[in-house]
Amino acid sequence: MRSKKMINEKLKMWWETARPKTLPLALASIFTGSALGYWANPQGFNGLVMVLCLLTTILLQVLSNFANDYGDHQKGSDTEERIGPLRGIQKGAISAKELKWGLILMVMASFLSGSFLIGIAYENLSDLFAFAGLGILAIVAAITYTVGVKPYGYMGLGDISVLVFFGLLGVGGTYYLQTHSIDSHIILPAIGSGLLASAVLNINNLRDIEQDAKAGKNTLAVRLGAYKGRVYHCILLSVAALCYLAFAVATAISWTNYLFVLAMPLLAKHAIFVYCSQQPSELRPILAQMSMISLLINILFSLGLLIG
C-alpha cells in the first residue's frame, strides 16, 4: 500500500510539473489552424494531420514546462518566496536528475511525433526540410527559454517566442500542412492566437515580477515594471481581438464568422481586473482563466468557420 501511495504521489508531482493548465495554449493554435485549413480546403482536410499536430504541440508544451522548471531551479530563480504554485522539484519530490531525464524523454517524444507528422503531411522535399528545421527549432526554443548560459527567457524575449510558436507557426504551420498553400488572410488569426498566448505568459511574469527581478530574470514584465506591464497586457488583448475581427470583416460570408465575439465580455472583464490589480498575488488564479479564455475564443472562432 505504501509503495502504491508513493507511486501515486510521484505521478501527481509529474502531472503538476507538466502544468496542465497551460495545455489549452497548445490546443488553441492547432484548432484555429485546422479550422482555417478546413475552411479553405474541406475536401483535402486530413484528420490524422490535425491529431498529430495536437499531439506534437502538447508534447512541446510539456517539454517547455519541464525545461522551465529545470532551468529556473538550476539558476535559483524559483524560491519559496514565489507566489505561483510550488513545483515538484522545489518540493524535493522530483530531483534535478529525474527532471533532466524527463526532459530527454519529452525531446524524444516530441521528435518522434513531429517526424511522423511531417512524414504524413509533406508533399515535396522543400516541405520536408522546412518543417524538419522548424521542428528542431521548436525543440531548441522550448529548452533554451530558461536552460543554458544565456536563456532568452531571462532577456525578456519570451513574449516574442510565444507569439511566433503559438501564433505564426502554430496556426500558419497547421494551415499549410492541411492546404499546402499560403493565404495572407490567415496572418490575422495567427497573430491573434499568438498574442492571446503571450498574454498568458505575461500574467505569469506579472505574478512573479518581484521574485524574477531579485533572481535577475529580466522578463518583459520586469523590464516594463508592474504598471506598464498591466497596460501592455491590455494592449495584447485589444490587438488580439482586433485581429480576429479584421479577419471576420475581410472574409465573412456568414454571421457565424463573428461567433468569437461571444467571448469578448470575458476578455474585457479579465483585462479590467488585471489593469486594476495592485498586488502580484491577486493574479495567481488568473493565469488559468486567461488560458481558458484564449482557448474559448479560438474554439468559437474555429466553430464559426466550420458551420459558416
From Swiss-Prot:
Pathway: Quinol/quinone metabolism; menaquinone biosynthesis; menaquinol from 1,4-dihydroxy-2-naphthoate: step 1/2
Any Pfam family hit: UbiA
Domain of life: Bacteria
Catalytic activity: an all-trans-polyprenyl diphosphate + 1,4-dihydroxy-2-naphthoate + H(+) = a 2-demethylmenaquinol + CO2 + diphosphate
GO molecular function: 1,4-dihydroxy-2-naphthoate polyprenyltransferase activity; prenyltransferase activity
The keyword Protease appears for this protein: no
Transmembrane stretches, start-end: 22-42, 47-67, 101-121, 129-149, 153-173, 186-206, 235-255, 256-276, 286-306
Topology term for the membrane: Multi-pass membrane protein
Cell membrane among keywords: yes
Cited CDD domains: PT_UbiA_UBIAD1
Example GO biological process: menaquinone biosynthetic process
The family this protein is said to belong to: Belongs to the MenA family. Type 1 subfamily.
HAMAP family xref list: MenA_1 (MF_01937)
NCBIfam families: menA, PRK06080.1-2
Function of the molecule: Conversion of 1,4-dihydroxy-2-naphthoate (DHNA) to demethylmenaquinone (DMK).
UniProt-recorded name of the protein: 1,4-dihydroxy-2-naphthoate octaprenyltransferase
Gene label: menA
